Design a protein with these regions (language model features):
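Conserved phosphate/oxyanion-binding catalytic-loop motifs
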Residues: 57
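Conserved phosphate-binding loops in N-terminal lobes of ATP-dependent enzymes
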Residues: 50
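Polytopic endomembrane small-metabolite transporters, centered on the Drug/Metabolite Transporter
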Residues: 84-86
Length: 346
């Protein structure tokens, strides 16, 4: 059964207690803030929403990220930053007895989190580690990867922080943590038993748990919303974990990708940016003729094409997304050539 975009009768910041925000492409791009993000987050917090920031980055300390966000005018405590190192170390600690020997292949942040969770870091396979945990580490050498492979071959349980194959850098796209993990997998024939990062939902689950450590009640899933710019990480993690989600257009995802998204990558809501946290969300409605309407905009599928009345508005995109998803799930072969081109006006 096709799952379509939903609506709310009150602003998202009031409809949900907890927002699980991605960072790059949502709050900032590299070193620069995303327009409207900080003001929108402050307004959401004033409305009673708790904010946690989730990132697959395993090398940056929480306080470093928090300081960057404070530089944008946000009031952020380090505990609100949920990195894949934080989640991975907790994941290993739950799987192994206290004090278990762990070989760490990763940055200092990952090593600190492993120690913080009561595990014992060992130097290499000669120390017979019970687990290996691998994160992104730009200073990784062949010998480090070989030692990880030797330990995994000897029976150590293999955990990873995330499986992102690439990472953007100023000069272009570079190998990410997942590319380095593939080297160990290829050498050993062993897949990691678990990954802490998105698109797994484990990060969102742990973020809700970590919120309780600050004296808050556990926020149920239905009162939590995952927010991100990437369908294949942020939104897929939400779908895997049964979280509602909001996809914003301030990062990598564009209107065409939204219309062509397969079922496991489809968000609950879409928005141009985080200002929509302060707005009720209109729900597209299908009439008897098969036309999808979202307030004054409409979209329909006819003769192999998705058509839209207004290719400049978010409501037009909302209607077109629903028309495209319905057509695709009924067997239509959609592509960039069969969906409308949008130019969303700010």
């Amino acid at each position: 059964m096709t799952r379509f975009l939903k609506g709310t009768d009150r602003p998202l910041a009031e409809a949900y207690q907890l927002a699980l925000l991605d960072l790059d492409g949502v709050v900032y791009r590299g070193k620069n803030p995303v327009e409207y993000a900080a003001d929108s987050i402050r307004a959401a917090e004033a409305a009673g929403m708790t904010i946690e920031y989730t990132t697959n980055n395993s090398s940056r300390f929480q306080h470093v990220v928090a300081d960057q966000l404070k530089g944008f005018g946000l009031d952020v405590e380090p505990w609100q930053v949920i990195t894949s190192s934080v989640v991975a170390a907790r994941m290993v600690a739950k799987a192994l007895p206290a004090g278990a020997r762990v070989q760490v292949l990763g940055a200092e942040h990952l090593r600190d989190e492993v120690t913080r969770n009561g595990l014992t870091i060992v130097d290499g396979p000669q120390d017979r580690p019970q687990a290996v945990i691998q994160g992104w580490y730009p200073d990784m050498t062949w010998q480090m990867m070989a030692d990880a492979a030797f330990a995994v071959e000897a029976g150590a349980t293999y955990f990873v922080t995330n499986r992102d194959l690439t990472i953007p850098r100023e000069l272009g796209i570079a190998p990410g943590c997942g590319s380095m993990i593939r080297a160990v997998i290829t050498a050993t024939g062993v897949e990691p038993v678990a990954s802490a990062g998105k698109p797994e939902a484990y990060m969102y689950d742990e973020a809700r748990e970590l919120n309780t450590a600050e004296g808050h009640d556990l926020v149920p899933k239905e009162a939590s919303i995952a927010i991100g710019d990437r369908l294949d990480t942020d939104i897929e993690a939400g779908n895997r974990g049964d979280y509602d989600s909001l996809a914003v257009l301030t990062g990598v995802t564009n209107p065409t990708e939204l219309m062509l998204a397969p079922s496991h990558l489809r968000p609950t809501f879409i928005a141009p940016d985080l200002r929509e946290l302060g707005e009720a969300q209109p729900e597209p409605v299908r009439d008897e003729s098969g036309t999808w309407e979202c307030r004054k905009a409409s979209a329909w599928f006819e003769n192999g094409q998705v058509h839209v009345s207004d290719p400049t508005s978010m409501d037009g995109l909302r209607a077109a997304v629903c028309a495209a998803w319905e057509a695709a799930d009924q067997g239509a072969q959609l592509s960039e050539a069969t969906v409308p081109v949008f130019a969303i006006e700010a």
